[in-house]
Amino acid sequence: LGLTDIDTPNLDRLASRGTQFSRAYNMGSWSGAVCVASRHMLITGRHIWRAQTASQTLRSGKKSTDEQKAAREKEFNNLWPQVMGRAGYQTFFTGKWHIQAPADKAFQVAQHIRGGMPNQTPQGYNRPLPDKPDPWSPYDEKFGGFWEGGRHWSEVVADDAVGYIGTAKKDERPFFMYIAFNAPHDPRQAPKEYVDRYPL
């Protein structure tokens, strides 16, 4: 995608065969995490100025009025996977959700659903500090985070997707798959081969 220091052959091939938007920008977020707004915009089909309202509507809780419950149901039924399901698609999700609606209800099949970033890796944040030892290693499984469970989370999500393709191809219906990798987020952990490929 124009970068020369990062090897992205699959993205380059996909971009060359599809449509590229050179001036499509995320205008920000209503929180410190821009990804929250991006995910809500994708799933709700709303631009930034309407996505927060959709998020608030989806979040309405147990003490909601009948009117709020009806608004939530209407918003939920217009989520991207719901629309695709009504259009005859199989729908599948794996990875980072972080949306104010249950993924396992929005999609026909949902696996390994995670919220935001792992927060149990304090060694990976606010580092390195001057005159302090830095024991952090992005590929050391002992720090947990994206290594929680013994495999890198990206490998788990990728395997879910590949496994589902094997299942979906047995069905004549087309399928819609939403795969959301967490790894671009803190604490920025990766297998050693990738750390070695892109030294800092």
Region locations from a protein language model:
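Formylglycine-dependent sulfatase
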Residues: 1-200
